[in-house]
Amino acid sequence: MTIIRKKHPLIKIINHSFIDLPTPSNISSWWNFGSLLGLCLIIQILTGLFLAMHYTSDTATAFSSVAHICRDVNYGWLIRYLHANGASMFFICLFLHVGRGIYYGSYNMIETWNMGIILLFAVMATAFMGYVLPWGQMSFWGATVITNLLSAIPYVGTTLVEWIWGGFSVDKATLTRFFAFHFILPFIITALVLVHLLFLHETGSNNPTGLNSDADKIPFHPYYTVKDFLGVLLLLMAFMILTLFFPDILGDPDNYTPANPLNTPPHIKPEWYFLFAYAILRSIPNKLGGVLALILSIFILALMPFLHTSKQRTLAFRPITQTMYWILVADLLILTWIGGQPVEYPFVIIGQTASIAYFAIIVIFMPIAGMIENNILDLD
């Protein structure tokens, strides 16, 4: 068996990636989220495949086809709720994975980090298009509002929006193409994940100390396969509790009303995992400015390697920057809450303050804190 594992051209690749991979001996449970994201992706592709067998991407029948899946297809309700809540679990794991990367300075592996940002954009695009497919009120109005943001682009904006819509409003053509893209994107994401792993295995994993761990590596299997399996069990348990006991808790009640272009819902808002970005978008009165802030709220992650001023890699031994980090986490939770609130006092001013704080912490306060710590520890 050892010979096949190490000699066979295909199995050899799997062996070097998941079995004999030299891994730091001290990586914590925060390093579990990569494998959990892989599991989420597999769950989403499988449940999505079975949903696609029964779904029709036509404005006249899309809503009814989802109802048909839940009522008439064997375990259709389960597949539908696994897929809907699977997206939420996916984003929870994504945010924790990115948060771990920021905390432990993993962004210094620039290729892996940039690939991760591209993956984040791709997953967000996929989730947005998936939310449109049930063709409920929030699906329709969410699609209208978010795609309409592109009209803020000077000169080509209006033409671009109509090109994406396939007409003069969100209609049958839009739904059909969103379904096509929603179906193909997860497979593109899978390919990008392999590139992400390829870049990661060029440098090897980071670890909580941020120090070089070449002197103390252990094989991935059995140590981290077992550790990852514990993470898988915990995730599946949380996932099953969410799906079987509270399937609609993260959804919007408006989406149980069929799409109606003549009736606008009182509060148009995206799914919970986009609310922080939506709050940043809304906090700027100018349309183009809002769109730029929205894109920058994610793209700012790409600047992190260049904003790193500390001589230490991780935040493990840097209490000042640690404080900044946890303020940033609290700020993102505030933005998420604000994104779901109506546009009125005091939510507007809270959202604007939190948006300024978000960019200020990343661009100004964390780099300054790094320099102060260098000075205190006399690392200059």
UniProtKB/Swiss-Prot annotation:
Cofactor(s) required for function per UniProt: heme b
Q: Please state the protein's primary subcellular location.
A: mitochondrion
For whether the record's keyword set contains tRNA processing, the answer is no
Sequence positions that bind heme b b566: H97, H196
Q: Which GO terms describe its cellular component?
A: mitochondrial inner membrane; respiratory chain complex III
Where found, per UniProt? Answer: Mitochondrion inner membrane
Query: What residue ranges are annotated as transmembrane?
Result: 33-53, 77-98, 113-133, 178-198, 226-246, 288-308, 320-340, 347-367
Give this protein's Gene Ontology molecular function annotations. metal ion binding; ubiquinol-cytochrome-c reductase activity
Cofactor: binding details: Binds 2 heme b groups non-covalently.
**Keyword terms, alphabetized:** Electron transport, Heme, Iron, Membrane, Metal-binding, Mitochondrion, Mitochondrion inner membrane, Respiratory chain, Transmembrane, Transmembrane helix, Transport, Ubiquinone
Q: Which domain of life is it from?
A: Eukaryota
Which residues are noted in the entry as a ubiquinone-binding? H201
As for membrane topology, the entry says: Multi-pass membrane protein
Task: List, in alphabetical order, the GO biological process terms annotated in this UniProt record.
Answer: mitochondrial electron transport, ubiquinol to cytochrome c
Positions of heme b b562 binding: H83, H182
Please tell me whether the keyword NADP is annotated for this protein: no
Q: Which PROSITE patterns match?
A: CYTB_CTER, CYTB_NTER
One Pfam family matching this protein: Cytochrome_B
- Tell me how this protein assembles: The cytochrome bc1 complex contains 11 subunits: 3 respiratory subunits (MT-CYB, CYC1 and UQCRFS1), 2 core proteins (UQCRC1 and UQCRC2) and 6 low-molecular weight proteins (UQCRH/QCR6, UQCRB/QCR7, UQCRQ/QCR8, UQCR10/QCR9, UQCR11/QCR10 and a cleavage product of UQCRFS1). This cytochrome bc1 complex then forms a dimer.
Cited function: Component of the ubiquinol-cytochrome c reductase complex (complex III or cytochrome b-c1 complex) that is part of the mitochondrial respiratory chain. The b-c1 complex mediates electron transfer from ubiquinol to cytochrome c. Contributes to the generation of a proton gradient across the mitochondrial membrane that is then used for ATP synthesis.
The record's family statement is: Belongs to the cytochrome b family.
Question: Which PANTHER family does this UniProt record tie to the protein?
Answer: CYTOCHROME B (PTHR19271:SF16)
UniProt miscellaneous comment: Heme 1 (or BL or b562) is low-potential and absorbs at about 562 nm, and heme 2 (or BH or b566) is high-potential and absorbs at about 566 nm.
Q: What is this protein called?
A: Cytochrome b
